[in-house]
Amino acid sequence: MLRTALRGAPRLLSRVQPRAPCLRRLWGRGARPEVAGRRRAWAWGWRRSSSEQGPGPAAALGRVEAAHYQLVYTCKVCGTRSSKRISKLAYHQGVVIVTCPGCQNHHIIADNLGWFSDLNGKRNIEEILTARGEQVHRVAGEGALELVLEAAGAPTSTAAPEAGEDEGPPSPGKTEPS
């Protein structure tokens, strides 16, 4: 009785489509159980086709590409530091506008479609800030730490330095010739 019920299963499965797009891709490319030789292992067909090496969806499953950037910025209007998740596609080919949570101002991050004429042909925040003489710091990785020295210059002291006091230990970021 079980054999009779399972005989019609491949026919039923050929008509069923999963709802999720990623499963549809797997389903459409040979992930159905094999019927050749009346093999009795339904799950084995899935396991066999999903572990095959080579081109196709099974090989592409292990490759993960981030589709978003994590943008961290400080608003120059109110000084609020915030973080936004933006699409890579929009950053490189579209328009990205973020809203500051502190003052509710809108900030243009990227304009690849030419919507804003006051940017003078600049396409993204990197080009805009470079034209102003400012820097954009890119940090790669999830556990990355970024330290930026904002005020470059010698520290000023209220007391007059005594003999030999102006030569202190070297700063951690500077190197001295030996």
Swiss-Prot record:
The keyword Protease does not apply. InterPro entries: Mt_import_TIM15, Znf_DNL-typ. A zinc finger (DNL-type) spans 64-161. It is found in: Mitochondrion. GO terms for biological process: chaperone-mediated protein complex assembly; protein folding; protein import into mitochondrial matrix; protein stabilization. Zn(2+) binds at residues 75, 78, 100, 103. Its main location: mitochondrion. Keywords: Chaperone, Metal-binding, Mitochondrion, Transit peptide, Zinc, Zinc-finger. One of its GO terms (cellular component) is nucleus. Residues 1-49 form a transit peptide. Disulfide bonds: none annotated. One of its GO terms (molecular function) is protein folding chaperone. Residues 151-178 are annotated as: Disordered. It holds the Pfam family zf-DNL. PANTHER family: DNL-TYPE ZINC FINGER PROTEIN. May function as a co-chaperone towards HSPA9/mortalin which, by itself, is prone to self-aggregation. Oligomerizes in a concentration-dependent fashion. Interacts with HSPA9. This is DNL-type zinc finger protein. It comes from Homo sapiens (Human).
